[in-house]
């Protein structure tokens, strides 16, 4: 019905009548002439814009673009004279053709070139959508990630898709995920409600990794589930045994509303910046708090940085939020 009406307009209408203001401000009822040729050009222009935007969102931004998002901050809990550089890799979603092994290798090289003190990975290593030519198995992408190098090491947590895509773990309600086993097999520690203390030039800090907050969401198809997440914020922070500042890794950012001021910085991914972000706004954000934790730097009781991530989930489409590696500088220059 709609298509027939549009066709009738395009083929039969030779003019449109509308009221418009004269130079003296009056309203006239003279016909405002739009030729069929001009109208069809307008429609064709809209179609071309839509087609080019779609092509860019599918074929260019998610595959060919890669940027470094830099943050220089000084949380109240962080010593002003203690500089620490953290490189953040989030939401790879390994699959062909959108996140190939060659693409992951390029990300590894770009990350290493940042010369960060420590590298953290925030989960979602598996594809997370069906629009692929090949799912890249963990025993292929994990060895590539093993090429990441930093003086204080490379440290990882898991994301919801690392849990959701592991059907055995979902059915049994327990066990180590394929992603975790693959990362640990290549020497990358995976934190699940655990912490580790580090020092740089004699200055201490803690790295805390939270279990995923949505881990067993698909398991509800197989059996009743008492608790969806495997996260335990209180247990995790209870393992911090002194007053050195804490950096919390949490795949989903929503936990920030419960994170106490004891934590200096929370690093999260998951949202992909909405995957479509125009003029600082994302129409769809996988967060209970909408735009609040969609992307970038904000502050609750602690500072929170949400990465736009590197890959795609649901659909291999990005517009206005290019894939990114994040580099956070705490203290030092950030305090100036």
Task: Annotate each PLM feature.
Residues 166-188, 200-246, 256, 318:
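Binuclear metal-dependent hydrolase catalytic cores centered on His/Asp/Glu-rich metal-binding motifs
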Residues 83-93, 204-214, 247-250, 303-309:
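Active-site-proximal beta-strand elements of phosphoester/diester hydrolases
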Residues 89-90, 119-124, 153-160, 191-193, ...:
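Active-site neighborhood of phospho(di)ester-bond hydrolases with catalytic His/Asp-centered motifs
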Residues 75-86, 188, 195-207, 299-304:
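Beta-strand-turn-beta hairpins that frame and shape the catalytic cleft
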Residues 26-50:
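N-terminal secretory signal peptides and thylakoid transit peptides that target proteins
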Residues 247, 252-330, 334:
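Conserved beta-sheet core of the metallophosphoesterase superfamily
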Residues 2-34:
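N-terminal secretory signal peptides
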Residues 85-181, 186:
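Membrane-embedded segments
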């Amino acid at each position: 019905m709609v298509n027939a009406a549009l066709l009738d307009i395009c083929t039969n209408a030779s003019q449109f009548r509308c009221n418009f203001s004269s130079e003296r401000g009056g309203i006239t009822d003279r016909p405002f002439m739009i030729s069929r040729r001009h109208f069809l050009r307008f429609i064709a222009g809209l179609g071309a814009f839509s087609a080019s935007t779609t092509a860019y969102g599918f074929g260019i931004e998610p595959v060919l673009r890669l940027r470094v998002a830099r943050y220089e901050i000084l949380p109240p809990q962080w010593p002003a004279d203690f500089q620490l550089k953290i490189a953040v890799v989030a939401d790879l979603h390994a699959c062909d053709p959108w996140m190939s092994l060659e693409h992951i290798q390029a990300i590894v090289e770009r990350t290493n070139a940042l010369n960060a003190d420590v590298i953290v990975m925030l989960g979602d290593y598996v594809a997370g959508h069906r629009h692929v030519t090949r799912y890249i198995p963990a025993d292929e992408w994990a060895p590539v990630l093993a090429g990441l190098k930093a003086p204080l090491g490379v440290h990882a947590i898991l994301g919801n898709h690392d849990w959701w895509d592991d059907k055995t773990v979902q059915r049994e309600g327990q066990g180590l995920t394929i992603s975790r086993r693959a990362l640990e097999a290549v020497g990358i520690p995976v934190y699940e409600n655990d912490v580790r203390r580090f020092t740089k030039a004699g200055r201490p800090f803690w790295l805390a990794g939270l279990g995923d907050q949505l881990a067993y969401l698909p398991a509800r198809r197989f059996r009743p589930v008492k608790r969806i997440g495997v996260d335990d914020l209180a247990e995790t922070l209870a393992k911090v045994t002194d007053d050195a500042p804490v950096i919390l890794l949490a795949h989903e950012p929503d936990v920030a509303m419960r994170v106490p001021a004891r934590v200096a910085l929370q690093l999260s991914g998951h949202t992909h910046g909405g995957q479509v972000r125009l003029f600082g706004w994302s129409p769809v954000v996988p967060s209970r708090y909408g735009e609040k934790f969609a992307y970038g730097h904000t502050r609750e009781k602690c500072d929170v940085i949400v990465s736009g991530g590197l890959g795609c989930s649901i659909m291999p489409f990005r517009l206005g939020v290019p894939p990114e590696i994040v580099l956070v500088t705490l203290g030092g220059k950030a305090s100036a």
